[in-house]
Amino acid sequence: METRKIIHVDMDAFYASVEQRDFPEYKGKPLIVGGPPNSRSVVSAASYEARKFGVRSAMPCSKAAQLAPQAIFVFPRFEVYKEVSKQIREIFLEYTDLVEMLSLDEGYLDVTFNKKNIPFAVTIAKEIRTEIFKRTELTASAGVGNSKFISKLASEKNKPNGLTVVLPDDVISFIDPLPVSSFHGVGKVTARKMKELGIYTGKDLRTKSIDELVQHFGKMGIYYYKISRGEDERMVQSSRERKSLGAESTFDRDKLDYDDLLKQLKDVAVVVERRLEKKDFAGKTLTLKIKFYDFSLKTRSKTLSEPIFKADELYSTAIELFEEFFEIKYGKKSAIKAIRLLGISLSHPNSENEDPNLFLNL
């Protein structure tokens, strides 16, 4: 069987780099794409100059301003980013039709059998990065491997403007020293739980039996067992139509307080808005997901007359669904039982089956 050749291409600080390209006065300066510095908006992107101060995507703009008071704040220009993204996708399609765009600034390519009959994936990755820079004046990082999991990890290895190749025989030695927090599917809460079990690196994860991992992480334990061995059979899906998108947040401590939970819900709505904008997605059906301290799960949905995508619309709709889970206790509004997770998703009204990756950890 032919060994798969998968490339993951990820643009470097995409939104910020487009702004620095179009406005030369921003070059070499800490630049933050998002809302005003004194707002509750979140950072959509930060230039590498801003990242040196600790500024990261999804961080509140107010916090970013504290970390980098000299930073320049600009509003995102999504129409411009979408046009550049189309240019990038056109380059990908010159090599293969098996292109899966994850967002405006990154995607997978399966080049096992490619249009130019180039035998080496690394050659294609080099050509793509060169062509992207030639046509857009932007840099991209790329990873080459035999699976989606490996190629994505590889693309993150030498950012910005880097290329990392992981040969099939080197997969285990590549995975072993990496922190599990860098693995797709391992969020902050899971990483913390893994550390409690003595799992810090890929090698630590690989020493655990499948039974141990299932005991502690449920069905995801099987996934963790496989990826620690470099096993990932997911195909590059060129025709995938996104039907839903959302985000969820797991709390360090279970929460009862109404006002505190509303703040958490607002934060989730802001992150969902950012992801919707990045994916150019809107939907009519909002689903609220609540997990209680005893791991019981409740979901409630509402279908609207028009598609929505803004945080305030998501938040106000979610609150309507949220109310039934509260009661007045001792003159104070509290959850009917302690809540450990909140999630919001948006989908098309004809989406019959939820995407298992719908709720991405914050």
From Swiss-Prot:
Its cofactor is Mg(2+). GO terms for cellular component: cytosol. SUPFAM superfamilies: DNA/RNA polymerases, Lesion bypass DNA polymerase (Y-family), little finger domain. It is found in: Cytoplasm. It holds the Pfam family IMS_HHH. InterPro entries: DNA/RNA_pol_sf, DNA_pol_Y-fam_lit_finger_sf, DNA_pol_Y-fam_little_finger, DNA_polymerase-Y, DNApol_IV, PolY_HhH_motif, Rev_trsase/Diguanyl_cyclase, UmuC. Keywords: Cytoplasm, DNA damage, DNA repair, DNA replication, DNA-binding, DNA-directed DNA polymerase, Magnesium, Metal-binding, Mutator protein, Nucleotidyltransferase, Transferase. NCBIfam families: PRK02406.1. This is DNA polymerase IV. It comes from Leptospira interrogans serogroup Icterohaemorrhagiae serovar copenhageni (strain Fiocruz L1-130). The gene is dinB.
